[in-house]
């Protein structure tokens, strides 16, 4: 007598296969979102941390930044950009974070008199160097001539890019530049104004150039 073929092991149905694999996948997803303990997270990469004061944190290094004429002794994560250090640690928020890719110029500061995109520069790179932000350029009672010219020529609209525009314009005064507007536009091309105040910006810069 032959064995009944139906009495042997049976293959799972399509419904059973989908049910089993679906449960396994769900378990994997849930495991992936499980909370991570502070001990295990400490060894993983996280957001850059900076501190002007506080305990000695592993991986944090000391740096002295001379900002607007004052030496600031800081402890920073080596990954911290100059922009984040200025804004988050020193609370100098006049330097703006725009694109954070070095394409808009809103984060422009001066380092030893030259213009630098602070979002592309690590704070650690500028140990001991002289850094100037918009806060160190002038005061409400004694504006820098470029700041006064921007006001006089209405060279801004929303104002978000203005600090970077002014910092670039001041540094540009020390750079080789032709006398015409086209030359000014070329040297200022790294600073974007989404509001389109370019004619007024150029007029303000030319006013200062002719006055000095």
Regions found by a protein language model. Give the residues of each.
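C-terminal segment of N-terminal export signals and the immediately downstream linker at the start
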Residues: 11, 32-74, 212
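N-terminal export leaders
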Residues: 13-34
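Immediate flanking context of iron-sulfur cluster ligation sites
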Residues: 84-103, 137-160, 175-194
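Iron-sulfur (Fe-S) cluster-binding segments and ferredoxin-like electron-carrier domains
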Residues: 106-136, 163-183, 198-212
């Amino acid at each position: 007598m032959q064995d009944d073929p139906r009495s042997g092991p049976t293959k799972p149905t399509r419904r059973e296969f989908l049910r089993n694999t679906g449960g396994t996948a769900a378990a994997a997803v849930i495991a992936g979102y499980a909370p991570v303990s502070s001990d295990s997270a400490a060894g993983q990469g996280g957001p850059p941390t900076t501190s002007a004061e506080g305990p000695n944190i592993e991986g944090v290094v000391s740096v002295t930044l001379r900002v607007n004429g004052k030496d600031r002794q800081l402890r920073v994560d080596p990954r911290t950009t100059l922009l984040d250090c200025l804004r988050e640690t020193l609370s100098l928020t006049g330097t703006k974070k725009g694109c954070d890719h070095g394409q808009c110029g809103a984060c422009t500061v001066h380092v030893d008199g030259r213009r630098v995109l602070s979002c592309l520069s690590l704070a650690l790179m500028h140990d001991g160097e002289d850094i100037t932000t918009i806060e160190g350029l002038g005061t409400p009672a004694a504006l820098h001539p470029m700041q006064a010219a921007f006001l006089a020529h209405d060279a801004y609209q929303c104002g978000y890019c203005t600090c970077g525009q002014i910092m670039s314009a001041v540094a540009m005064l020390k750079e080789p530049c032709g006398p015409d507007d086209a030359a000014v536009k070329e040297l200022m091309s790294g600073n974007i104004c989404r509001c389109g105040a370019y004619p007024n910006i150029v007029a303000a810069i030319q006013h200062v150039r002719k006055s000095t």
